[in-house]
Amino acid sequence: MTTIVRAHDVARTEHAHAAEVLRPEVAAMRALLGELSAEEWLMATDCPRWNVRDIVAHVLGNAEAALAPDLMVLRAREGALRYPRLYRLDALNEMAVDAWRDRQAGELAAEFAPLWRQVIRALPGMTEAVRGQTFDTGYPGTLPVAMGYVVDVVLARDMWMHRVDICRATGRAFVTHEHDRGVVEQVLRDLDDAWTGPPLVLELTGVVSGGWQIGADAPVATVRGDAVGVLRMFSGRVEPQPDLVVEHGDSAVLGAFRDARVPF
């Protein structure tokens, strides 16, 4: 019998442990990049406008922003001018990709490990003043996000999801690791904290399995789906739609569930 955990009760990643959470994901991504052929670096991904190489450039840009928040501010300002039709965060991400545009794929792969090692070493010493800085993504209906939340929680899940993107683009199997559960549970906590739909039980299968209650009151339904597919949906990657099954209860919960989004 599956033990049901209230997602809200999952402990938030503490700043003191953020580097420990990030380290295994960096290792997993590094291993994947080391296996890619020249052709695979050019393959299109589920991220609009980006191929595999662009995703890696974006991830390197995340490392640069974590090490130098002022650079993030500068790129956001310049991105608003260069990409005026994009949301602020999307424009920032494009600026990071542009910054690595002239580098070869092999150079990106070589820079990945040392740059992220710097981030892992620097995280414990990040000051509260920097952690308290906020960034407006520009997405409708969303609040500014704190830098502390980004480095403690989002960096690991964003890289995890982009590892999924690369595997899907290249047809490679997504290699599972012990830290996957922690990444998934932080997403579900954020989902629960912002949830306004009917309470439900979410049963995940695949790379991470288990049961989590979303919402405070008695669940009206149990929804089952593949962990990777469900997290892709929460990130806004809506195609292909995950195969969701209402095990019992009110199937109307699927509407709110499919519309839910979590920051990545």
Model-derived regions, located:
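Short, helix-capping/interhelical loops that line the mouth of catalytic, cofactor-
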Residues: 1-17, 65-124, 134
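Hydrophobic packing residues in well-ordered alpha-helices of helical domains and bundles
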Residues: 19-22, 109-112, 152-155, 159
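Amphipathic, well-ordered alpha-helical segments in soluble domains
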Residues: 25-32, 62, 115, 158
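Globin-like tetrapyrrole-binding proteins
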Residues: 131
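Glycine/small-residue-rich hydrophobic helix-like segments
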Residues: 193-233
